[in-house]
Design a protein with these regions (language model features):
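Charged DNA-binding/catalytic regions of mobile-element recombinases
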Residues: 1-171
Length: 171
C-alpha cells in the first residue's frame, strides 16, 4: 500500500560501559515499578549511540535523555560527540533548570557517568533519590531502553546518515 513502510528489529550489540572503579553505587530503589501517579515522581536516564559516515570514516554521536515515567515524555536531552561525564551532567542540569521544584526518584544503569561521585552530589543537591539497575539487568531500566528502541527502529535503522547535521536533525 502507498506510504506504508516496514521496519525491522535489529539485534542490539550495545552495552553499558561500567565504571572500572565506581565512586558511588545506589540500590535499585525503583524495582521495576514503572508506574508514576504524578509528573516528576520518577525519572529514568540513559545514553545511546548513533553513527554517521563521511566517506569511509565512521563518526559517533551520543544522545543522553531523561524520561518522566508519568507520561513517558523526555524531560531533557543533549547530543554530543563524546560519551563522557559532561554529556550526562549537562542533561541533568538542563532538567533541573526546567523543573527546579521536582525531586523525583532518579534511576539509571551503572554506567561510569552515573557512578561518579560528582553526579551523586548533583542529585543530592537537587533533592533527588538515586536508584540504579542491578548489574546486567537492562530490564530494570526497561521504559528508557524501550524508548531508545522505538526511536532507532522508526528513525535510524535502515538509513545511512552522511553528515552530523543530518543525524542531529533526525534525532
Amino acid at each position: 500500500a502507498k506510504g506504508i513502510k516496514s521496519t525491522i528489529k535489529y539485534s542490539s550489540h550495545g552495552y553499558t560501559r561500567q565504571a572500572s572503579e565506581p565512586q558511588y553505587l545506589a540500590e535499585n530503589v525503583l524495582k521495576r515499578e514503572f508506574y508514576a501517579d504524578r509528573p516528576n515522581a520518577k525519572r529514568l536516564t540513559d545514553v545511546t549511540e548513533f553513527k554517521y559516515y563521511i566517506g569511509l570514516e565512521v563518526h559517533k554521536l551520543y544522545l543522553s535523555a531523561i524520561l518522566d515515567l508519568f507520561d513517558r515524555r523526555i524531560v531533557s536531552c543533549v547530543i554530543r560527540d563524546r560519551n563522557d561525564n559532561a554529556l550526562v551532567f549537562q542533561t541533568f542540569e538542563k532538567a533541573v533548570a526546567e523543573t527546579p521544584d521536582a525531586h523525583p526518584l532518579f534511576h539509571s544503569d551503572r554506567g561510569f557517568q552515573y557512578t561518579n561521585r560528582v553526579f551523586h552530589t548533583k542529585l543530592e543537591r537537587a533533592g533527588m533519590t538515586q536508584s540504579m539497575s542491578r548489574v546486567g539487568k537492562c530490564i530494570d531500566n526497561g521504559p528508557m531502553e524501550g524508548f531508545w528502541g522505538i526511536l532507532k527502529r522508526e528513525r535510524y535503522y535502515g538509513r545511512r546518515f552522511t553528515s552530523r547535521e543530518e543525524l542531529v536533525k533526525m534525532i
